């Protein structure tokens, strides 16, 4: 199964997913990878497909998997979401349809129109990562840290207070109140799993001798600068080749100076058109910016 891309509004990272374990998080992100940019259309998964997306290593029966799926949505419904523009707090009903069929081993989901903005029409201020990398992490704390780090992938730095860090990662009070417990239960698995993957370093901040926050630094995802040849010269090219871009399949390109990361940023609209290397490289690409078009000039 080709690697899938998870993409959602940064606002979703402000929601603390309470009572989610590692499997619940994998279920949610697997679903998110397939419903993105699908509006409110109903999307069906087979249990076999879901297992593949989750890279499920636990030997769960179909009934146990069905229970985990149902629990995932139940935990979402137990959360509150605050709309930034109005300050209203409502039940986090992310899906209007969430139908689990253990007998036929299928799941049907449809995104609630009210929350569709979290997963659709994303051209700026969003988090994006590879589902396979997320699923391969074992600790729920490593998974929750990973998606926040991906929000800041372009800067490579996340500054957060101790209290906010513990809230976002849903750290229990008994763990958050004790520095030794916080180090052992939360930070240790984050360092062990995300350290090699992200090049992670942690700077602890103190106020009045008390641990007050963290500065996490990690490798920036900055595409290399490419050689921008004159547009006229490029337009004269009449041949190209197919190149595989994870999450987008095969992309036809007429440039030999191809960069996968820059291409994904162009397709997703991670960067504005004015800063996009492919839009600067060829004016024709501007018409296709953030539209998932399968051609690059």
Curated annotation (Swiss-Prot):
Keyword set, alphabetical order: DNA replication, Plasmid
Listed transmembrane segments: none
Molecular functions (GO terms): DNA-directed DNA polymerase activity
Biological process according to GO: DNA replication initiation
InterPro entries tied to this protein: Initiator_Rep_WH1, WH-like_DNA-bd_sf, WH_DNA-bd_sf
Pfam families, A to Z: Rep3_C (PF21205), Rep3_N (PF01051)
Disulfide bonds: none
Family: Belongs to the initiator RepB protein family.
UniProt-recorded name of the protein: Probable replication protein rep
The organism of origin for this protein: Bifidobacterium longum (strain NCC 2705)
